[in-house]
Amino acid sequence: MLVTKPYQRERAVEYAKKWALSQNPLFADFSEIGGNCTNFASQCVLAGSCVMNYTPDFGWYYVSLEDRAPAWTGVDYFYDFMTMAPSFASRNGGVGPFASLVSAEAAELGDVVQLRNASGAWYHSLVITGKEGEEILVSAQTNDVIDRPLSSYNYADARFLHIEGVRIEVNDDQCYQILLAGGADPTQPQN
């Protein structure tokens, strides 16, 4: 049974600001093999969710350079996983963070922005780490930055992925036993 727990936005932002200008040794650096931006965005979302989906090909996980899901490092695959694109949702069981497309005004700290170039390719993932009035501030790797104004980037379009929550799996039998014994409701997130 899947239940939804809140996304910890403040943790995603704290992680982004701590690691944007250096590489966390727990993760490979993809800067020389296509870019590190979505790897970094995934790390930030992981900091706010602490759940991975280990489904081969259609999940969202990182174990090592050689053992990771395409959605961990690929801009389009990340989008497909987070927005539960039909090709992903039907194959990965739904565990993990999930997002919806929102306007720039509705985007919040800890959300992810993806940029499209003039030729139509989505090429960059950034994490929203601040707002100054109407200005969105982002942190990212591959051109490492902290709190850079989004308006200073040159891009044709942007999409804003609002992380709605995190789906986790709860064992139905365990749920029943806890409820029967009068314990805490296991379908409710424990903070």
Which residues does each PLM region occupy?
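...with weaker cross-activation on analogous glycine-rich loops/strands in unrelated enzymes
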Residues: 62-138
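Low-complexity, Gly/Ser/Thr/Pro-rich intrinsically disordered linker/tail segments
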Residues: 137-142, 150-191
